[in-house]
């Protein structure tokens, strides 16, 4: 009798975050699973704003664990590690972690004498995507390893400098508040101008003059933006507000590369309606999102507000900005004016484009325990992991054909919602539910659904019935979305219909769609 070689037989799809089989305890005493080194590093990297404390780990402990894991894999698996770092800075949008990771990658490989795999120079260049980041990497290196900067680091930075330095970037990022000015970096790495950018040699010389002879430095004629900026700076203070209010004022500010951050200082006065309306056309999308409340307080016109709303809700702008979904919730809470609610809802939806529309019946569980509320996601955010979990869980439930949305902690409860309802409105229904009894939540709400998705930090409390994934029949997929990157998971993963993903963006949700279609999940940079 044929038992395996049948048309109905299908290999169980696998995923990349893999447990080792070793039993460890979660921070709350639950029976957890150790993950292999690559899996532990990936989950930590995609959820780790460097030096940010969490409920169970100090910022220093997390940073040390990240560096230790990365140094190990830089030597033993350099291709995988280089792929992670490039993806982390790009689609993963974890800027500081990628920069720190690149420095640790190079240091570990130089110390070990390793030469196989992607070059140190290539990895350094791959994580530097913004003009201020060469200085960030240099500052981290010298603070951690001293002022002797090895050649691969210098060459990688030089490659990035040729790609990133131009007139506007110099105005925005080459400021007196920086420890490493553009001129310092050019002196240190000896970057040659890009031969395809004939103006860059003059720009480099000007950056050096600005650093060493600021009173006599003259902007090059090959850079109209630097010349226009110098003209504005030379205007007497009493004449500056007229530039803002006169016809063509917005265009003149944009041509001079004057950012909204610099405008108030240049005016030496308040950012009133006229000032905001002049600078709004040249502001980036996320700068607009962060300043919605300021626009309301200044009384910007409905016409200007409509142009802001159109840009915020534009899918191409959202994709270009590469912002985390929780940024739009933060803006919604900070500026609850009705005129911003709809474009922010649109933007949030576009930022969750990879969240799948799952068929059949789905149980979605959102962790609202105390540890999820403990610390902010980043220095610039007032939101926490509980907020991020609610965003992802709600989006999953709304897009699924038939979903039960449950919040859990010490207790659990089902949340009601209507098809097509606003994600931002549903988020107001979530609460703070204390401890982390994930097992009981699943036992209370699993009623034969086709799959279970849990958005959590995985630090569940001991339960005599076992780990959360054991409460679901073995043939039913259980997907865990990890938002914290702690070492121990709440169940097995990688095979047998048990899968773990992670991060604060929607990027890895693509893997859910792969597995649902019977294909193996892959690391995001290999998908």
Report the location of each language-model feature.
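Long lumenal/extracellular ectodomains of secretory and single-pass membrane proteins
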Residues: 2-383, 398-527
């Amino acid at each position: 009798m044929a038992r395996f070689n049948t048309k109905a037989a299908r290999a169980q799809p696998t995923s990349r975050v893999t447990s080792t089989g070793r039993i460890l305890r979660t921070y709350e005493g639950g029976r957890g699973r150790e993950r292999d080194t690559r899996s532990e590093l990936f989950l930590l990297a995609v959820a780790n704003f460097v030096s940010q404390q969490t409920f169970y780990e100090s910022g220093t402990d997390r940073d040390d664990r990240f560096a230790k894991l990365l140094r190990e894999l830089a030597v033993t698996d350099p291709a995988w590690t280089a792929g992670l770092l490039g993806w982390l800075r790009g689609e993963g949008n974890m800027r500081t972690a990628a920069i720190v990771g690149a420095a640790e990658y190079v240091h570990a490989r130089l110390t070990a004498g390793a030469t196989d795999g992607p070059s140190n120079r290539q990895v350094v260049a791959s994580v530097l995507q913004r003009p201020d980041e060469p200085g960030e990497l240099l500052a981290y290196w010298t603070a951690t390893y001293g002022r002797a900067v090895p050649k691969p680091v210098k060459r990688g930075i030089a490659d990035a400098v040729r790609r990133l330095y131009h007139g506007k970037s110099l105005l925005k990022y080459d400021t007196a508040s920086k420890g490493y000015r553009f001129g310092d970096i050019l002196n240190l790495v000896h970057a040659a101008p890009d031969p395809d950018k004939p103006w860059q040699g003059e720009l480099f010389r000007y950056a050096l003059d600005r650093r060493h002879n600021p009173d006599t430095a003259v902007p090059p004629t090959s850079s109209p933006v630097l010349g226009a900026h110098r003209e504005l700076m030379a205007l007497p203070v009493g004449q500056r507000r007229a530039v803002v209010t006169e016809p063509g004022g917005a265009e003149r500010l944009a041509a001079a590369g004057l950012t909204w951050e610099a405008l108030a200082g240049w005016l030496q006065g308040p950012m009133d309606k006229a000032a905001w309306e002049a600078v709004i056309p040249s502001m980036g999308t996320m700068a607009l999102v962060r300043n919605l409340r300021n626009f309301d307080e200044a009384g910007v016109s409905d016409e200007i507000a409509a142009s802001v709303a159109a840009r915020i809700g534009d899918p191409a702008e959202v994709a270009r900005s590469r912002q985390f979904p929780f940024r739009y919730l933060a803006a919604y809470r900070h500026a609850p004016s009705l005129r911003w609610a709809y474009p922010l809802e649109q933007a949030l939806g576009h930022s969750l484009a990879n969240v799948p529309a799952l068929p059949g019946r789905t149980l979605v569980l959102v962790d609202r325990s105390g540890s999820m509320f403990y610390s902010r996601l980043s220095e610039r955010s007032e939101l926490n992991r509980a907020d991020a979990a609610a965003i992802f869980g709600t989006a999953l439930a709304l897009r699924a054909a038939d979903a039960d949305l449950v919040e859990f902690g010490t207790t659990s409860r089902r949340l009601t919602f209507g098809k097509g309802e606003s994600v931002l409105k549903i988020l107001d229904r979530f609460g703070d539910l204390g401890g982390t009894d994930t097992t009981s939540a699943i036992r209370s709400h699993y009623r034969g659904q086709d799959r279970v998705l849990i958005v959590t930090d995985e630090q569940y409390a001991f339960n005599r019935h076992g780990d959360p994934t054991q409460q679901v029949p073995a043939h039913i997929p259980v997907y865990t979305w990890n938002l914290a990157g702690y070492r121990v998971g709440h169940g097995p993963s990688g095979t047998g219909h048990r899968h773990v993903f992670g991060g604060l963006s929607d990027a890895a949700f693509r893997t859910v769609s792969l597995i649902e279609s019977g294909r193996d999940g892959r690391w995001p940079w290999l998908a």
